[in-house]
A protein has these predicted regions:
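N-terminal, active-site-proximal structural segment of metallo-dependent hydrolase catalytic domains
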Residues: 1-124
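Soluble catalytic domains of enzymes that build or remodel membrane lipids, polysaccharides, and related
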Residues: 92-105, 115-283
Length: 283
């Protein structure tokens, strides 16, 4: 146990370094927090009170770093949302028919299809009845909405990636929904892509709601600067996020202060490599 605590302390401290090694360790802080929690309870159970106290210090250190950018235990939002709104996020699908049927079956208000592999298939001919293809089908990211879109389009993110956005009227006012997938991009390209997203958000008059895979943890420096520059918040807590708890969390819902995150769950992947995620909000 002593060796484990020494390693945890070293990794937790080294994660503050600005070099590549420090940034690599920094993305694992949530796992350091979980491991410190387990060590603390194990030490308490075996009456190793000094080790338990040291584990508590490491737990608090990593907790405060993580919670500075993302809710850890409870989702964000002030509980003022009145309209329930369901979204499905599907990165890089190869079977549009499966994801369209899933959206229809789940009665999703919005479907984000990010960087699809179309193989010559046109989305416009597969859109379920009662849904609207928010933009043309050029083989890039797009949105499908149950509400008539006010406007829609894409943002080039570099590296062949694109973000899809759509403006919808909900409860008498406009909201802009933006979705993308930055996973697998280099750190430099991720930061460039966030710069493009930042410029888009800054130019919008209506509240912007962002959901997808940022390819980095919310407490990373680049993500922190992005949130601060737009006064946005991460809304989903880490225990309800739609990814593996044993891996660094990179999938988030980001929005304005009053936006309420109601929950999320992973859905069956069916004919696609990546499983879609169902996200529920109150707007």
């Amino acid at each position: 146990m002593k060796s484990l605590l020494v390693l945890l302390a070293f990794f937790s401290a080294a994660a503050f370094a600005g070099n590549a090694f420090g940034q690599f360790l920094n993305q694992w802080r949530f796992q350091f927090y979980l491991l410190s929690l387990l060590v603390m309870f194990y030490a308490l159970f075996n009456r190793f009170f000094l080790y338990s106290f040291l584990a508590l210090l490491l737990l608090l250190l990593n907790f405060f770093v993580v919670s500075s950018s993302v809710p850890v235990l409870f989702s964000g939002g002030e509980g003022k949302g009145k309209t329930a709104f369901g979204m499905i996020y599907q990165p890089r699908p190869s079977s549009l028919l499966d994801i369209f049927e899933t959206a229809d079956r789940r009665r999703a208000d919005l479907l984000a299809v990010i960087d699809p592999v179309l193989n010559g298939v046109s989305p416009s001919g597969l859109v379920p009845a009662g849904y609207h293809l928010a933009d043309n089908d050029e083989g890039k990211s797009f949105m499908v909405s149950s509400r008539p879109p006010r406007s829609a389009g894409r943002i080039g993110l570099g590296g062949g990636r694109s973000a899809a956005f759509v403006s919808l009227e909900i409860g008498g006012r406009g909201y802009v929904f933006l979705s993308f997938d930055l996973s697998g991009m280099s750190r430099r390209n991720k930061e460039k892509a966030l710069g493009y997203v930042n410029a888009f958000v800054a130019a919008e008059d209506d509240p912007v709601i962002i959901f997808g895979d940022f390819g980095m943890t919310a407490w990373s420096p680049a993500f922190g600067r992005f949130l601060a520059s737009n006064r946005l918040e991460v809304k989903n807590d880490l225990f309800s996020r739609f990814a593996n708890l044993l891996m660094p969390p990179t999938q988030y819902v980001v929005g304005y202060r009053n936006l309420e995150f109601a929950g999320s769950r992973r859905l069956p992947s069916l004919g696609n490599r990546s499983a879609p995620s169902l996200i529920r909000l109150k707007i």
